[in-house]
Amino acid sequence: MSSNKINKKSIARIAAVQAIYQNILQNNDDMDDIMQNVLSFYQNNNSITDLPENLKISLSISHFKMLVKSVFENIHKLDEIIDNHLTNDKDPAHMPILLRALLRVSICELLFCPTTPAKVVINEYTDIANDMLNEHEIGFVNSVLDKIAKEHIRLI
């Protein structure tokens, strides 16, 4: 039986979205506590119950920690960017928590991780959005990331 693996950075991105979601939902600003909770979940594959038997999940701990720390360090700038991309009829206070968490992490990686090509960031987070958000929100994520990439001259 062959072993299947998912890219470690892809898992780190999902885990970072989960950590930031937890931060927002629990109003918990203890970054180390949040990171430890999420890491312990991923380090114990037994806690993930609906995986195929031969699928191995592991994440890039360094990429995960870098993403979460960068979001915490830049949270006000990230929220300002997100809010500036909302249409006039959208109230930032009513943005779904999961959408805000995904946008915080994805925009953070787009802006503060110059080693990751913009196209990769956009594709990865659009794929993550496909698994977590509704169709309208997926399009919004793709549109916002594309605009930010172009605004910051990291052309695709």
Swiss-Prot record:
<comment type="similarity">
    <text>Belongs to the NusB family.</text>
</comment>
<keyword id="KW-0805">Transcription regulation</keyword>
<dbReference type="InterPro" id="IPR011605">
    <property type="entry name" value="NusB_fam"/>
</dbReference>
<dbReference type="InterPro" id="IPR035926">
    <property type="entry name" value="NusB-like_sf"/>
</dbReference>
<dbReference type="InterPro" id="IPR006027">
    <property type="entry name" value="NusB_RsmB_TIM44"/>
</dbReference>
<keyword id="KW-0804">Transcription</keyword>
<protein>
    <recommendedName>
        <fullName>Transcription antitermination protein NusB</fullName>
    </recommendedName>
</protein>
<keyword id="KW-0889">Transcription antitermination</keyword>
<dbReference type="GO" id="GO:0003723">
    <property type="term" value="F:RNA binding"/>
</dbReference>
<dbReference type="GO" id="GO:0006353">
    <property type="term" value="P:DNA-templated transcription termination"/>
</dbReference>
<keyword id="KW-0694">RNA-binding</keyword>
<dbReference type="GO" id="GO:0031564">
    <property type="term" value="P:transcription antitermination"/>
</dbReference>
<comment type="function">
    <text>Involved in transcription antitermination. Required for transcription of ribosomal RNA (rRNA) genes. Binds specifically to the boxA antiterminator sequence of the ribosomal RNA (rrn) operons.</text>
</comment>
<dbReference type="GO" id="GO:0005829">
    <property type="term" value="C:cytosol"/>
</dbReference>
<dbReference type="Pfam" id="PF01029">
    <property type="entry name" value="NusB"/>
</dbReference>
